[in-house]
Amino acid sequence: KTVNLDNYCGYAEMGEGEEIVGIAGHLDIVPVGGDWSYNPFELTRKGDYVYGRGTTDDKGPVMEALYAMKLLRDSGVKLNKRVRLIMGCNEETGSRCMQHYNEVAEELSCGFTPDASFPCIHGEKGHMGMTVYSKNTKIIAMNGGFVSNAVCDNCTAVIPAEDGLKEKLEAAFANTKLQEYKVTEENGEIHIEAKGVPAHASTPTLGVNAAGVIFECLEQVGFEDDFVKFYNSHIGTSCDGVGVGLKCQDAYGELTLCNGIVKTEDGVISCTIDIRVPVTFKEEDIRSMCEGKLEDENGRIEINSIGNPLFFPRESPLVEALYKAYVDVTGDTENEPMVIGGGTYAKTLKNIIAFGPEKLGVDYRIHGSDEYILVSEMEEAVLIYMEAIKNLLAI
C-alpha cells in the first residue's frame, strides 16, 4: 500500500494491526555547491563506493529500509503490526513534511529514522538559530555559503583598496587552513575569494569557515572596520559560542556554533548562525546566558528560533531494541548508544529515534562535494534494519 500525503510526504506500508512501526527518511537534499569529481545527480559507482548527492543523506538509507521491509516480507515473518516507510521532502529546511504528517496521519507506535549513525542515537541536541547584522562597515560586499546547516566553505569579499593591503592579506591567508584563496586589486577595490572546508553544522570543527577566516585576517592585517571587530569578538573562527556567552557542555556533549551563510543586501552584511545546544539545557538557560551580549555599536544579533532537545533514556525499550539489532548483526559491543548534535525527524515525529546508517568516525562528505556511501555498508545496513523491524514488532 502506498499513500501520497498532499505531496508533503508519502509512505509505503505492509502488514496489519492498529500499531505502526515507522521508518522515516527524507528524499530532499541540500544544494550541491563545491567541486564534484562526479555528476552529483547521477549515481556513479567506483568499486565499493557509490557517489552522488543523497547517497548517505538520505536517499540511500531510504532504499536500505525499503529493501529491509521486502526481505522481511519475503521471509514469511508474521506482521502483527503495520510497518510504514515514510518518505519526506522537507527535512533539510524545517521538516514541514513531518509536521504535515502529524496533522493528517496516524501516530507511530515506535520506529526510527535512518538519518544518522550506528549504533543508535538516544538523544539530539537542541537547536538555536541566530542572524548577525552589521551596523557600520567599509566592506563593499561579502557573500558565501549555501545553507544555514553547513559550514560556510566558500566566500567572496570586496573591500576598498589600501596601500600594501593586498600583499598583507596574501601573507595572512597563507598561514590559515584555507584550501584555496585569491586576492586581486582593481579599480580601487580588493577582491577576495576563499575556499574553506565543508562540514555539517552539527560538527563544525571538522570544517573551515571561509567567511570567518576572511574576517579574522582583515583584522589581523590592520583593516579598521566596525563590523569586522564585532564578528571576530562575537562569532570568530571558534565553534564554541564563547563570544556570545554560550560556551557550555553537559555529560552528553558541548555546545557548537556554525556560520552557514553570509550575504550582503542594501549595504548590510548578515550571517546565519546554527547552534546545537546540549540536551540538558533549556530555552530559558540559553536566553539568560547570552542576555546583554548580542548587540553593541558595531553590530547586532537576533535570535530567530530555539528548539528543545530530544532525549530517550539509554534503558528505554526502543533504544534497547534497536541497539540489539545492531549488535546482533555486527557483533560490535564497544560502541554504545549516543547523543548527537544533528537534528532529525525524531524531533518532529513521536516515539522514534535516529538509527544508522553511518559508521562512527567516517566522513561521508554529507553536505559536501563527492558525497558517497559504500555498497558493502548498505548491504549490512539492510540486515540491521530487518532485525530492527523484527525487534520493534515484538515490543
Residue ranges and their predicted role:
Residues 16-22, 199-201:
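Short, charged/polar, Gly/Pro-enriched secondary-structure boundary elements
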Residues 3, 198-266, 272, 276-288, ...:
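An extended, acidic, His-containing surface patch that forms the Zn2+-binding/catalytic region
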Residues 92, 98-278:
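Midchain, well-structured core segments that form catalytic/ion-binding scaffolds
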Residues 28, 173-181, 221-222, 292-298, ...:
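A common structural junction motif
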Residues 20-87, 93, 104-109, 368-371, ...:
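Active-site metal-coordination/substrate-binding segment of hydrolases
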Residues 1-4, 45, 139, 180-183, ...:
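Short secondary-structure junctions
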Residues 1-19, 41-44:
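A non-catalytic alpha/beta surface segment that caps or lines the substrate-entry region
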Residues 80-88, 141, 229-232, 303:
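Beta-strand segments within the central parallel beta-sheet cores of soluble alpha/beta enzyme folds
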